Amino acid sequence: MTRHFCASVFVIDPDTKKILLVKHKKFNKWVQPGGHIEENETPEEAALRETYEEPRVKVKLLGERFPREDDFIRPLGIQRNTNNQGDLHIDITYVGIPVNKIDTTVSNESTDSGWFDKMELLYLNVFPDIRITYDYIMREVIK
């Protein structure tokens, strides 16, 4: 089994309460922006890079830094996903808010991107944990 370390960001616009999602080419599902952590890259750097590469949105990651200012931001969580080939993807997930209010674009890894509210999320083709995580973020992080 090959292990892949990844980073992703649940980007939430606090004004509209919408979540930013990209439509993944391989899965044909809407997912949070993210991807593999590159060599000599921290999870935070990968999360910020992937969010800018895919939908072209710059974000500020939310979370606490313990115990020193130069420590990493505490992620929302770590997800474990296994693909059809048996590869394990360990995804360090963050919450972020957009710094720039520009329209999203599409990368070579996705077919579409957009902002969705809670009602729209109910009808999108997403993995179940996307809806669960959105509700948790709205309840515990964004408030």
Regions found by a protein language model. Give the residues of each.
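Short connector loops at helix/strand junctions that flank enzyme active sites
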Residues: 2-6, 25, 32, 85-91
